[in-house]
Amino acid sequence: MSTKNKKAAGGNGVAPKQTRQQSHDSQDYSSFKTVLFYCMLIVFLPVLTFFVLKGFVLDQFLDISEVKVNIASAVGAVVALHIALGLYIYRAYFGAPGSKGSKTD
């Protein structure tokens, strides 16, 4: 009789395991989206900054030589890269609100 009770009580053991797996999957997907966002930011923000500064800001509004425009655009791109990296490090160090992981055995 004890096996009947165990089977009856243990039949619902699959649902919490599946719910836990879905929870882990959603956490993994959320982490993937965050890392993908910061990777895209780190790659594309400096490139976009370089060409926006070069093409729209420095060439049209300031009357300086081509070499100085390129140097100023490169400096702007480096600053943009450091800002993106700083945002990523800040997010990685302090974490998102409510992302405190709980240990499960």
Curated annotation (Swiss-Prot):
It is a multi-pass membrane protein. The keyword Transferase does not apply. Belongs to the VMA21 family. Coiled coil: none annotated. Required for the assembly of the V0 complex of the vacuolar ATPase (V-ATPase) in the endoplasmic reticulum. This is Vacuolar ATPase assembly integral membrane protein VMA21 homolog. InterPro entries: Vma21 (IPR019013). Residues 1-36, 90-105 are cytoplasmic. Keywords: Cytoplasmic vesicle, Endoplasmic reticulum, Membrane, Transmembrane, Transmembrane helix. Residues 1-26 are annotated as: Disordered. One of its GO terms (cellular component) is ER to Golgi transport vesicle membrane. Its main location: endoplasmic reticulum. One of its GO terms (biological process) is vacuolar proton-transporting V-type ATPase complex assembly. Residues 58-68 are lumenal. It is found in: Endoplasmic reticulum membrane; Endoplasmic reticulum-Golgi intermediate compartment membrane; Cytoplasmic vesicle, COPII-coated vesicle membrane. The chain crosses the membrane at residues 37-57, 69-89.
